[in-house]
């Protein structure tokens, strides 16, 4: 008999930095998930990734208190800020530009995010990334 899934939990956890402290511990504890077991498994799975990168994780937990999780790629905004060396986006996107990004960099970000984006081809993925860049106050050039 298959395990019965009780629910799912979506979190964004820095790569290699899952700890039982808030906000992770309480979110998992409320659902009866073994916090230390998740932290060890998550940190092991993300040790090859860039330290501190925010990794979206979807945790599926079951009736017998076990769980499985799947990792996604970091958000587009993380890649954009990293490419242009920004701390944060524009306070007034569309009016105040905080930097420029080339189409080549947009393409490389779209290729990295392709498996998580709801796009059929790289051109559609690039348009999604361009939209995110514009909403952060970045100018797309090239």
From Swiss-Prot:
InterPro entries for this protein? Ribosomal_uL11, Ribosomal_uL11_bac-typ, Ribosomal_uL11_C, Ribosomal_uL11_C_sf, Ribosomal_uL11_CS, Ribosomal_uL11_N, Ribosomal_uL11_N_sf
Instruction: Kindly state which keywords UniProt assigns to this record, in alphabetical order.
Output: Methylation, Ribonucleoprotein, Ribosomal protein, RNA-binding, rRNA-binding
Pfam families the UniProt entry points to: Ribosomal_L11, Ribosomal_L11_N
Q: Subunit info?
A: Part of the ribosomal stalk of the 50S ribosomal subunit. Interacts with L10 and the large rRNA to form the base of the stalk. L10 forms an elongated spine to which L12 dimers bind in a sequential fashion forming a multimeric L10(L12)X complex.
Q: Which family does it belong to?
A: Belongs to the universal ribosomal protein uL11 family.
Biological role = Forms part of the ribosomal stalk which helps the ribosome interact with GTP-bound translation factors.
Ribosomal protein listed as a keyword? yes
Q: What does the PTM comment of the record read?
A: One or more lysine residues are methylated.
Give any single GO term for biological process: translation
Q: Name a GO CC annotation attached to this entry.
A: cytosolic large ribosomal subunit
Gene name, Swiss-Prot/TrEMBL = rplK
Question: What protein name applies here?
Answer: Large ribosomal subunit protein uL11
Which GO molecular function terms does the record list? Answer: large ribosomal subunit rRNA binding; structural constituent of ribosome
CDD domains with a match to the protein in the record: Ribosomal_L11
